[in-house]
């Protein structure tokens, strides 16, 4: 297929299950690699992209919204959104500021310290949207963002997505044609991996994009990595929220180790005792060996 997107529009991808909607989304987001053809980003081919280049592209230029939210249950709402910035080398104070702004933008500025299990499905999806926006990506990819929500909450989420699409490209996979017709500026229909309908096709040659600075080029040299201290802090928080299970696991492991040590010690002691009995018994009944020479006359 061949398709191009404008810098700011809300594109809905429609089609039956298995027609390639999610695969298309994953290729655009750099999650899957194409086997033929090319993915051109801001006029630049990605054929020569290495793993580090894809990491930079995913981390700085693309935001992902999934149907299942993918929030970390033991982290607060604010920490979940901040986590998207940990790979960008952003300072803690800056992470906190940007995360708060993103949550306020989606209407959750007064629920920063709640846990995901204390929120409704619509609120968790708003947290996921805030997490996708906190890096200020050029492209927002949404895979069934309203699939697990009721109709009223779906409308609220779509209103939010429509507002976001005013200053960036939003590509959404959905099975809901009614929502797509109402909120999208463009609808693309797929069938067996091919485009069979496009309500507002875009030709870059006839309608060139007007962008002074390309974020992909600006962030080309930036390194994406998580510091050891950050990873240690996340692990510690995970353990602290599961104290009971951690204690029981440690206790059971300790019993197992102690049991193995006792068995080995007992086995070694029994073997040593048997050897000692053998030595003392043989010492009480010495065995003498005599050598006799017999002469045979023929």
Language-model region placement:
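Conserved ABC ATPase signature
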Residues: 115-125
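Conserved catalytic motifs of ABC-family nucleotide-binding domains
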Residues: 136
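Helix-to-loop junction immediately C-terminal to a conserved catalytic motif
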Residues: 29
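Conserved small/polar residues in nucleotide/adenosyl-binding loops
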Residues: 297-298
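The feature captures the beta-strand-to-loop junction immediately N-terminal to the Walker
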Residues: 14-16
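Alpha-helical transmembrane segments
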Residues: 245, 258-288
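Catalytic Walker B motif of ABC-type/P-loop ATPase nucleotide-binding domains
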Residues: 140-143
